[in-house]
Amino acid sequence: DREEMIKNVLNGHGTAAYSVCDKMPWYNEESEVTYDQKSAKALLEEAGWKEGKDGIREKDGVRAEFTVMFNPDDSVRQALAEDFANQCKELGIEVKTEGAGWDVAYDKALSQPLVWGWGAHTPMELYNIYHTGTDSDSAEYSPYANETVDHYMDEALQADTLEDSYDLWKKAQWDGTTGVTQDGDIPWIWFCNVDHLYYVRDGLKVAEQKIHPHGHGWSIVNNVDQWEWSK
């Protein structure tokens, strides 16, 4: 429940996220999914995951449990991990959380879920997290590989213009048969887009902001030439 997560963790200052490129021109709206806990439980039951006495599901002697890592220096990521764990418990899945520094997390991320932060004004973000690495058999930040997805992105990079590449980037996300959305391989789960909050001096009129990239840079002053003081 992304909206509940935004309420609990961000005090409402965020929007639901479904991909690394929400609302960008190359965004595929097929990435969006409706929250439905009842259907999620039904799918688990149908797949043979039955609740044990402690409420955690099991199948063939295997408990539905795993660990999610987060950067201990980032309180927001820790809170997101904890909220995710609480919501999973309602489904009968036990999620343990673990603070891990980047020196450890980068290596473990290929076999263990990690709370990341991404987002930039370029479709290369899709390439960075989903394309198979040059010297490996998986993507750089997750154990993911899909030749069809790779092909779409390779073709997109060869397009004559950025605009000509949009459809190929969208197909890399979902082409009706395969991709990285919830109907495809879904190697990443996207939680939320965090609103950047600032103190503003009385009388200063800040121009309408475009979507801010993840956490870095000077996006707030991207259009400072359009700011003005109230008369």
Predicted regions located by residue number:
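Detector for C-terminal structural segments
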Residues: 1-32, 36-39, 76-85, 105-231
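Ligand/substrate-recognition segments at binding pockets and active sites
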Residues: 50-121, 196
